[in-house]
Amino acid sequence: MKKILGLILFFILTGCANTMKPTDFKDQKPRLIIEDYLSGNVKAWGVLQNRSGKVTRQFKADLNGKWNGSQLILDEIFNWTDGEKQTRQWTINKIDEHNYEGTASDVVGTAKGF
């Protein structure tokens, strides 16, 4: 369960442009340690919503993360409830203690997490 919560938090922090800051969570438990949460096999699930909040798609995902020093290779397999299957491979680099950057071949630009 901690891995799933950590993964959700990771994608919220890396995928959304907002005013949230890592310091907003500094006293939260358990502490999010990306190297622990994204190592090995992780199960995830989620929904996509339109601007009015209506759920438009749902998915379950299997992730597998392998660290090599400060670099993570994260393989994702998404199974959408409409039957679509999607795969993605992220290369995530740890920049320093609090900053990460990730790229994937089907994602434009660089994801930044902190």
Question: What is each PLM-predicted segment?
Answer:
Residues 2-7:
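Sec-dependent signal peptide recognition
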Residues 45, 50-114:
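Central antiparallel beta-sheet cores of small beta-barrel/beta-sandwich binding domains
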